[in-house]
């Protein structure tokens, strides 16, 4: 036991009438919604990097947090893990996520970093034995160190490609050893700053081959989890190749991986790409590649990825409605890729940020489930496209342009526009949130 969270009680559900800030008002893990426990719907995960590794810096200032585990030794990494599991237990969090660089100190060589990772993974595995918290996904940090400044899989230097591939192998091994449900790849440096020094064809082909190797290794070691890519349009790169859901799907199709890889979609990244969160979720679901989500929000005025905790439940309800329509999570879940503000220095701030985020998502899920169970929105959607269920419409899809023209002339087809009824549906939505 550490004393970092001393005096903070285990968070329990007390209902909407509770005035206890260290309690859930909406998140009741055992509440059954649409035939499944709320905990199983939401599958919350705590992000190791923002919660325990982030020093509180921003582009204009450095560290504001003074955590007792900050440092570059294995003993401090183990202390960080001990503190992390204490918070997982306080929250009753079912899952966590990590990058390799979050949990182990960087070594002077690849071999030393590999040994450090293996040792800390053993320590985390021991902590997991006494906790309900499991691993939602692991990943490799292929963007922070200066060696990755020109990319990892897309780097012009083959040695960086090699280092990156070896790093991913080790992280996949660690994820499998800890029983992870997924493995994520995020290409923060897989992009370019200027076309003047960039070979787009080579970089795309190398990225595709890299991903094929990842999938091959997954099958070789018998990893039963899902491989996920996380789209983001820019930041830190000027232009990233995994721009959004549509772009990544095209990439997967190009390299024959659309049946092997799904997506981890982040709210903040969707906004940066000029989309709504629900758009990206709905599109991924329609393409069969919706895997998991990173839950956060951006400051809509700042123009960059602020990774704040969610607090707008009507907005989140739109997202969870699309997840419910898609059948819910299988191996995926709701990872809080969110960080407290750099002025929020206290241990209580870290816990309460997660309490608020979990309550916001639970409230959103309940609203989405009520509307989904009511069926009115789906009925309106079906009615709008009902004409396509007729034999004539189905026959038209199997015919040719010449045959369709002949039918239009013969039947004198002259369609009149029909209302999309958007305002009615928005009013319907508001009744449930």
Swiss-Prot record:
What broad class of enzyme is this? isomerase
Cofactor: record remark: Binds 2 magnesium ions per subunit.
What is the scientific name of the source organism?
A: Cereibacter sphaeroides (strain ATCC 17029 / ATH 2.4.9)
Q: Which HAMAP family match?
A: Xylose_isom_A
> Where along this sequence does the record place binding of Mg(2+) 2?
266, 269, 305, 307
State how it assembles: Homotetramer.
* Keywords tagged on the record: Carbohydrate metabolism, Cytoplasm, Isomerase, Magnesium, Metal-binding, Xylose metabolism
Question: Does the record's keyword annotation contain Isomerase?
Answer: yes
Q: Which cofactor does it need?
A: Mg(2+)
**What GO biological process, any one, is recorded here?**
D-xylose metabolic process
Q: Look up keyword Isomerase and say if it applies.
A: yes
Protein known as: Xylose isomerase
State the superkingdom.
Bacteria
The UniProt record lists the EC number as: 5.3.1.5
Q: Name one GO cellular component term.
A: cytoplasm
Which coarse location class applies to the principal site listed for this UniProt protein? Answer: cytoplasm
Provide the GO MF annotations for this entry: magnesium ion binding; xylose isomerase activity
Give the positions the UniProt entry annotates as the active site: 99, 102
InterPro entries reported for this sequence: Xyl_isomerase-like_sf (IPR036237), Xylose_isom_bac (IPR013452), Xylose_isomerase (IPR001998)
| PROSITE patterns named among the record's database cross-references | XYLOSE_ISOMERASE (PS51415)
Which amino acids does the record list as binding Mg(2+) 1? 230, 266, 294, 337
């Amino acid at each position: 036991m550490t004393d970092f969270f001393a005096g903070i009680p285990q968070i329990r559900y007390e209902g909407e009438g509770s005035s206890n800030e260290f309690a859930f008002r909406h998140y009741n893990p055992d509440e059954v919604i649409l035939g499944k426990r709320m905990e199983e719907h939401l599958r919350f995960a705590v992000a190791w990097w923002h919660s325990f590794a982030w020093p509180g810096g921003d582009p204009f200032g450095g560290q504001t947090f003074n955590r007792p585990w900050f440092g570059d030794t294995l003993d401090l990494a183990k202390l960080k893990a001990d503190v992390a599991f204490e918070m997982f237990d306080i929250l009753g969090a079912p899952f966590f996520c990590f990058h390799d660089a979050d949990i182990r100190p960087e070594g002077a060589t690849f071999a030393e970093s590999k040994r450090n990772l293996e040792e800390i993974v053993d320590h985390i595995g021991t902590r997991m034995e006494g906790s309900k918290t499991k691993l939602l996904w692991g990943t490799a940090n292929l963007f922070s160190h200066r060696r990755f400044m020109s990319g990892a899989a897309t780097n012009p230097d083959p040695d960086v490609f090699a280092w990156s591939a070896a790093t991913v192998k080790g992280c996949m091994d660690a994820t499998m050893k800890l029983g992870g449900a997924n493995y994520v790849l995020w290409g923060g440096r897989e992009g370019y700053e200027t076309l003047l020094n960039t070979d787009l064809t080579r970089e795309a082909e190398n990225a595709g081959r890299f991903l094929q190797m990842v999938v091959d290794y997954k099958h070789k070691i018998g990893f039963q989890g899902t491989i996920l890519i996380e789209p983001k349009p820019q930041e830190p790169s000027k232009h990233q190749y995994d721009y959004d859901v549509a772009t990544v799907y095209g990439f997967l199709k190009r390299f024959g991986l659309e049946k092997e890889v799904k997506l981890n979609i982040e709210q903040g990244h969707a906004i940066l790409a000029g989309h709504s969160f629900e758009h990206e979720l709905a599109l991924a679901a329609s393409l069969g590649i919706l895997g998991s989500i990173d839950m956060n929000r951006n400051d809509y005025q700042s123009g960059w990825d602020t990774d704040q905790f969610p607090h707008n439940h009507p907005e989140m309800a739109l997202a969870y409605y699309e997840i419910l329509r898609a059948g819910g999570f299988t191996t995926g879940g709701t990872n809080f890729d969110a960080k407290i503000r750099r002025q929020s220095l206290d241990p209580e701030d870290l816990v309460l940020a997660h309490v608020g985020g979990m309550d916001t998502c639970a409230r959103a899920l309940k609203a989405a489930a009520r509307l989904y169970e009511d069926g009115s929105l789906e009925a309106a959607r079906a009615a709008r496209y009902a004409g396509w269920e007729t034999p004539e419409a189905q026959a038209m899809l199997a015919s040719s342009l010449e045959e369709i023209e002949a039918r239009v002339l013969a039947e004198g087809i002259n369609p009149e526009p029909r209302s999309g009824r958007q305002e009615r549906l928005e009013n319907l939505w508001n009744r449930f949130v």
